[in-house]
Regions:
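Beta-propeller-forming repeat regions
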Residues: 22-509
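Bacterial Sec-dependent N-terminal signal peptides
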Residues: 1-29
Length: 509
């Protein structure tokens, strides 16, 4: 194993200097690989998120991980030093931890703690400084509870909500659902998803309710308020890859009162559900946040935030989508647009990836391409060349896409980290690695060390005979010669504030 791992370490970044050579921005330095961390055996379906855990002024990286599905590992949740890439701490898991971290100082030590979930069902709070377990959700405790007895499956990503029990700490909103043993198209064994609020200090459940339609849920809930309003809204979804679903809007008040039956259906889909979390952004220019979603059946919708009428729709027949939209100012107006990629065919016989940019104003297609094979990471966004129009950074896999995920494995595999310049309709490579793949992890971009330049942190996974199995992984930090001149609006999975809300006034700089 070690021979195979070390074999590929020097195999990358043939084009890391391209950013300097093409003079994206005036710069005093070239791109450089700051560090590379190899980890044998394990892999990840999580995405990196950052917080300064050792109080050294540089953001550190947390990611969920594990071995293959249903396997235990002592490397289930990992924290890496942002300066060196060395492991700060690790937490064990009994199954894959595929969620991405939520940060909140729950123990009052001035260092943000980590909340993260995964399969079987796992939801943990971890001391951000030491890696010690603060609390863990215990499903056995609730086997006789009329609602929580259904929360025995996957914990997806969580988001912070305002303090609900007056202990001075924000609390956790999350969803549990999705029975991996349920057969496709069958309703048997598909328990209702459970939306819940937990005390961030103790893990006690403050409130919970089942999905109004009784269906499963895989979607991370999105929590927001409209400008000028104190009402707190929750958008959540139901259904799966082969099961009908609905998109709902409700209020935190209704969840706290166990009245999710009062939630309003704002979209529905037959034969597919809502899996990717929606993006919240103003596309009408009325100052109110709208809801932009895409179903697993690749029907994109913009829904008005005031009265919930459908503003526009766009459907992509013969494709599927589990990837979130990344919003940005990609076209020549001041209305945010929405970029993602969708998969040709039907899982597991997906035969390629289509990159799609939807104009936020009217739902028209502003850009479309087909590079690489199917993957389930999401884009991140920044104006790399400082021309006033954003670019998107994505991870793609190159292999024989016609093989899909169910047939014999591809003999060769290449992972590329690329950026798309929509104004010039060009794609450029940031990093390229033979023998690696990335099926799930979204990159992170931001100023990790506060030096005024953009960093990118991303994961790659050693190619295995089974595309979805793990053989080991590596995490890499590259320092780009791109000055951070403006707010980073969408620099990680679900945005730079990790909540799915596109808000230029609250983005990270």
């Amino acid at each position: 194993m070690q021979t195979q791992l070390t074999r590929f370490v020097g195999f990358s970044i043939f084009s890391l200097i391209f950013l300097h050579a093409c003079s994206l921005v005036p710069s005093k330095k070239q791109s450089k690989l700051v560090w590379n961390k190899d980890l044998p055996v394990i892999g990840s379906q999580s995405s990196p998120r950052t917080a300064d855990l050792n109080n050294d002024g540089t953001l550190d990286i947390v990611i969920g991980a594990g071995k293959n599905e249903y396997q235990e590992s002592d490397m289930g949740i990992l924290a890496f030093d942002g300066k060196s890439g060395e492991l700060l701490w690790k937490q064990k898991c009994r199954d894959q931890v595929f969620g991405s971290a939520t940060f909140c100082d729950a123990n009052g030590d001035k260092i943000k703690d980590v909340f993260i979930g995964g399969r079987s069902p796992q939801l943990k709070a971890i001391d951000g400084k030491t890696g010690a377990l603060l609390w863990e959700y215990n499903a056995i405790r609730y086997v006789n509870d009329p609602i929580l007895r259904f929360a025995q499956f996957n914990f997806n990503n969580s988001v912070l909500v305002a303090d609900q029990n007056n202990d001075g700490v924000d609390d956790i909103l999350t969803v549990n659902g999705g029975n991996s043993y349920a057969a496709p198209y069958s309703q048997q064994g598909r328990m209702p998803g459970v939306l819940m609020v937990l005390d961030a200090k103790t893990g006690n459940v403050i409130a919970a309710d089942t999905m109004p339609d009784g269906k499963e849920s895989y979607m991370t809930p999105v929590y927001f308020s409209q400008p000028g309003s104190d009402e707190k809204y929750i958008v959540f979804g139901t259904g799966g890859e082969t099961i009908d679903g609905n998109l709902y809007i409700s209020t935190l008040r209704d969840l706290l009162s166990k009245k999710l039956t009062a939630a309003k259906i704002i979209a529905t889909e037959k034969g597919h559900g809502f899996i990717a979390p929606p993006t919240i952004a103003d596309v009408t220019g009325d100052g109110q946040l709208d809801i932009i979603a895409i179903t697993h059946g690749s029907k994109a919708l913009a829904i008005d935030g005031k009265d919930h009428h459908v503003i526009w729709t766009k459907t992509f027949p013969g494709t599927e989508c589990s990837n979130s939209f990344a919003p940005g100012y990609f076209t020549d107006d001041d209305v945010p647009d929405f970029f993602t990629f969708i998969s040709k065919g039907q899982w597991p016989n997906s035969t390629g990836s289509i990159q799609v940019l939807i104009n936020g104003k009217d739902g028209s297609i502003s850009y479309m391409d087909s590079i690489g094979c199917t993957g389930y990471s999401s884009p991140v966004v920044y104006d790399l060349d400082n021309d006033g129009r954003d670019e998107a950074i994505i991870s793609i896999n190159n292999f024989d896409c016609s093989l899909g995920y169910a047939s014999k494995p591809p003999r060769t595999m290449e992972n590329r980290l690329v950026y798309i310049n929509f104004a010039k309709r060009s794609t450029k490579t940031i990093d390229q690695s033979q023998g690696f793949k990335n099926i799930f992890s979204t990159p992170w971009i931001g100023d990790l060390d506060n030096d005024g330049y953009l960093d990118v942190v991303y994961c790659q996974y050693y190619h295995h005979s089974d595309l979805l199995s793990f053989l080991g992984m590596r995490m890499r930090r590259v320092d780009l010669p791109v000055r951070v001149r403006k707010n980073i609006l969408w620099g990680e999975y679900m945005g730079s504030n990790a909540n799915g809300v596109f808000s230029p006034n609250t983005a990270k700089f």
